[in-house]
From Swiss-Prot:
Domain comment quoted from the record: The Q motif is unique to and characteristic of the DEAD box family of RNA helicases and controls ATP binding and hydrolysis.
Organism listed in the record: Arabidopsis thaliana (Mouse-ear cress)
Name of the protein in question: DEAD-box ATP-dependent RNA helicase 36
Biased composition (Polar residues): 24-56
Chain ranges for the short sequence motif DEAD box as given in the UniProt record: 210-213
Keyword terms of this UniProt record: ATP-binding, Helicase, Hydrolase, Nucleotide-binding
GO biological process: embryo sac development; megagametogenesis; post-embryonic development; rRNA processing
Keyword Metal-binding appears in the UniProt entry: no
Domain of life per record: Eukaryota
Amino acid sequence: MEEPTPEEEGGITIMSKSRKNPKTVVNIQSQKLDSDQNTPQFEKFTNPNPSSDTTSATNFEGLGLAEWAVETCKELGMRKPTPVQTHCVPKILAGRDVLGLAQTGSGKTAAFALPILHRLAEDPYGVFALVVTPTRELAFQLAEQFKALGSCLNLRCSVIVGGMDMLTQTMSLVSRPHIVITTPGRIKVLLENNPDVPPVFSRTKFLVLDEADRVLDVGFQDELRTIFQCLPKSRQTLLFSATMTSNLQALLEHSSNKAYFYEAYEGLKTVDTLTQQFIFEDKDAKELYLVHILSQMEDKGIRSAMIFVSTCRTCQRLSLMLDELEVENIAMHSLNSQSMRLSALSKFKSGKVPILLATDVASRGLDIPTVDLVINYDIPRDPRDYVHRVGRTARAGRGGLAVSIITETDVKLIHKIEEEVGKKMEPYNKKVITDSLEVTKVSKAKRVAMMKMLDNGFEDKVKDRRKLKRKTLADKGLLKKRGKRQKSTEN
């Protein structure tokens, strides 16, 4: 296959591979790439079993961090560095570009936040670091973690995401906060529409792509190009992700000689304390058995549950249906306002609401300490997404239950998931529901929910979102490439 050609500036490059256009390249670093080298110019450390890593530092002092940072870690209960922190923090402090691949919950955020704050304390100015993340919720969570780790620095941190007032955000950027955490779309708009914004990043020392596999998705190419054009060539680029993708693999193949790659790969594994079960039913009975599972929460000692669905429409419909059945719940999806999404997450995390319905916006990265039950109402098409979803429960050595409601069309997906995770799902101990009153009650609640969605304009929102998405894809020349995916997407 013909080798991809780096763009003019070279450096670490990301190739967005597709069957129709294998040479689409997104440049994410401005240092020169020596394309004549046959041997990849990077240092790589592969850690196949991070849980038994004997090279991990015994304390944070050993990573080269300042005393204040070490004390802050102790105050936050961080007694010993995780493997990804042990291997990546010293390299970042040494000025290296870093790609860190490690599982969810491995401490990736602190692995880049601590060395950034260490350097900021030595030479404080704004904007010192730009952190790009795929979702609004992750952006706010990252801001909380930066503020906690930099609590003694009088840190100024700004979150720039969609769904919030752009004038206020522009003023926040012009005030030059130390750390800017953003989603790709909103920062692109501000950079292009206000000439006062690009100079803010003229001295930025660090660029971080968190959940890099998702940020580097082909749909974000234009946003990334706009971002990179305003950043200085002397910056450090840090990428952290839970999974390897073709874009990140291309990074390994086309990297600058300064890059360090840490990979903690244990395959797509689920923890031993997680019980994985399934219910096999007709498509028309999915709502009925969802309600059946939820009705058993109290008897099973389950305090909190997350229900994952594939679309915003399904998320809203199920939430309204459960409301009608007087099952306390809250929904989080991208058609909700930002304040509603943050409120939903806060209420669920605090235990005020026991059930959270969500699209995959909540499957990765979000710090939700205790979830007893995960329900896959819709089966994800990628086994990695399944692992991220069920990884919301059975954390930190605790037990957890994951139940997947599958239909005839999901069987191949389930077999693929079982093959990838190396574990068979067990049948859920369900009763056969024959009570006509129960069936009628759920059916009526479903109809009421659908009528409410028509009456309150939610269906119009879905149609408008679909039109906007198709227009965006068409403007980027991606509509034909992603046509099949578009048909199955109701966002």
